């Protein structure tokens, strides 16, 4: 375990942009090192106090849907090399699960989420801020596949949500947050050149911290 503060890489972008692919590529490159992934998706607000009809109205693409206070608290604890208990979100019940995931601190933290660059408090904790930029048509196709296969949604509900929620929220909150990125990666996880540049930059930062 390092004696210095861990390196935090923030990876943002629209739903279906390829954030997970970029995150996995970086994680796989450094998997022999001390590295972890912290997903903003796990930090949706607990809604157990609300009836199901109210939970179903949740706008998961709005900044207020996230419990960023808890996410920031956990990130600060990990930066202090303290263990945290990451929440699990149940998308079928539309609320936080009673289960948790213990997360041990690591020297490299990849923070991934659609709106992590929208919150200045999170940006302040990042060493590298990345925005994965992908064509809207490709993003909706990826989101449809994920929500149908992994979250039990119907195609009609996914399309309706995209038109009425996802697209306007992307234009209002996610796209504007791109200006806070240090690096913008077009073509998502297929852009191997950009990923290689990121890997080199991360390795340089890690080496500098070791030599401090």
Swiss-Prot record:
Q: Name one GO biological process term.
A: UMP salvage
This protein's species is Bacillus mycoides (strain KBAB4) (Bacillus weihenstephanensis)
* EC numbers, comma separated: 2.7.1.48
Q: What class of enzyme is it?
A: transferase
Q: In which pathway does it act?
A: Pyrimidine metabolism; CTP biosynthesis via salvage pathway; CTP from cytidine: step 1/3; Pyrimidine metabolism; UMP biosynthesis via salvage pathway; UMP from uridine: step 1/1
Q: Which SUPFAM superfamilies match?
A: P-loop containing nucleoside triphosphate hydrolases
Query: What GO molecular functions are on record for this protein?
Result: ATP binding; cytidine kinase activity; uridine kinase activity
Pfam families, alphabetically?
PRK (PF00485)
What are the annotated GO cellular component locations?
cytoplasm
The text of the family note is: Belongs to the uridine kinase family.
Which residues bind ATP per the record? 13-20
Q: What is this protein called?
A: Uridine kinase
Q: Where in the cell is it found?
A: Cytoplasm
Q: Which reaction does it catalyse?
A: uridine + ATP = UMP + ADP + H(+); cytidine + ATP = CMP + ADP + H(+)
Which residues constitute the signal peptide according to the record?
none
Main location per the UniProt record:
cytoplasm
Superkingdom field: Bacteria
Query: What keywords does the record list, in alphabetical order?
Result: ATP-binding, Cytoplasm, Kinase, Nucleotide-binding, Transferase
